[in-house]
């Protein structure tokens, strides 16, 4: 009996030691990858002939890509150039043959997570292939998965809230979906085209800007969050190009804007600039506590290149959201983000290869 107990105890200890060694080894390698500035890329392919992507616009200010999947079905995927990790929402797993193609991997050395390879989800080869995320590490079971994929996150409180206020969202496509490609987003005509490059010869045109990206020593993009500039009241302000910027309205906000919608397109501005605008322009419209994140201000005129457009709504965000948060994925500290409340006035072409953006009206 004592021998059996000893063998059992030794077996348990050995098993625990094995898992401990595995866990700390994987954590070590994952940390080295996350600290590295090396860039993970998908197989390079030539730019294809420009292609109109099936898209659904919301109020002409935000958009969902209609991803074609099996059984002639589609996935409504929210397009967000300012977003992070791309994912497939858990509520979409039963569409088409998605469930048959789901895989289970390991993150952080121990946590299981479901994912689907992008090639197993999207059936139209004309659709752009997202860039693999260099910092989000999934292993299957031990080897790192380097192919483009969409993870299926657990249905936790933050995701539940996101899907509650945007129930049509079946997938989320963040920065890595847009990287390595060129896009034309025509807001007035509610059309999106991909493979629409801007050559370096465009740089001297008045309504073309050079974008900033966080890069490594080899000048390769580490992240895909683009910085650019806008001008308000004579001041040039660095901002994030953010197609997914969204206001989540409070009940007070719904009353102020005369809508029963839970969300509207938005743009964001740092509190220091917001407070300056409030002090210098008390006549500008102001909507206190209209957004769950804070107050909203209406700026009459915003200048992009030679164009003056407006009015444009901005939601206040604390300065630390930019100086301590977004700086981790951007080339500089920006002071805000321009979303659909400003972009709706333009036909925008953005090229992640030449790092150029052009605004047309």
Where are these regions (language model features)?
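Pepsin/retropepsin-fold aspartyl endopeptidases
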Residues: 2-361
């Amino acid at each position: 009996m004592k021998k059996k107990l000893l063998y059992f105890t030794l077996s348990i200890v050995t098993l625990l030691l094995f898992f401990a060694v595995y866990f700390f080894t994987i954590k070590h390698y994952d940390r080295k990858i996350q600290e590295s500035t090396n860039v993970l890329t998908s197989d390079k392919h030539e730019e294809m002939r420009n292609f109109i992507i099936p898209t659904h616009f919301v109020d002409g200010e935000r958009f969902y890509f209609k991803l074609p999947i099996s059984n002639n079905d589609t996935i409504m995927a929210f397009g967000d150039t300012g977003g992070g990790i791309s994912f497939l929402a858990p509520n979409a797993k039963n569409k088409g043959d998605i469930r048959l193609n789901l895989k289970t991997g390991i993150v952080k050395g121990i946590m299981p997570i479901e994912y689907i390879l992008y090639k197993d989800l999207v059936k139209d080869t004309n659709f752009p292939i997202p860039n693999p995320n260099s910092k989000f590490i999934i292993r299957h079971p031990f080897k790192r998965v380097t192919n483009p994929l969409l993870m299926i996150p657990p249905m936790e409180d933050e995701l539940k809230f996101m899907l509650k206020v945007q129930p049509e969202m079946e997938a989320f496509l963040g920065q890595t979906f847009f990287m390595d490609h060129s896009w034309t987003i025509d807001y007035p005509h509610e059309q999106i085209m991909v493979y629409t490059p801007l050559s370096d010869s465009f740089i001297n045109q008045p309504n073309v800007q050079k974008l900033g990206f966080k890069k490594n020593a080899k000048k390769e993009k580490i992240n895909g969050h683009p910085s650019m500039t806008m001008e308000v009241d004579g001041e040039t302000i660095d901002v994030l190009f953010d197609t997914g910027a969204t206001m989540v309205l409070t009940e007070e906000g719904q009353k102020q804007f005369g809508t029963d919608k839970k969300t509207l397109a938005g743009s964001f501005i740092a509190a220091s600039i917001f407070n300056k605008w409030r002090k210098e322009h008390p006549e500008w419209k102001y909507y206190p506590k209209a957004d769950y994140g804070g107050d909203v201000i209406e700026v009459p005129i915003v200048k992009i290149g030679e164009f003056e457009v407006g009015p444009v709504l901005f939601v206040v965000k604390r300065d630390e959201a930019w100086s301590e948060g977004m700086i981790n994925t951007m080339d500089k500290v920006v002071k805000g983000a321009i979303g659909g409340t400003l972009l709706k006035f333009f036909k925008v072409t953005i090229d992640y290869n030449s790092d150029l953006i052009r605004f047309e009206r």
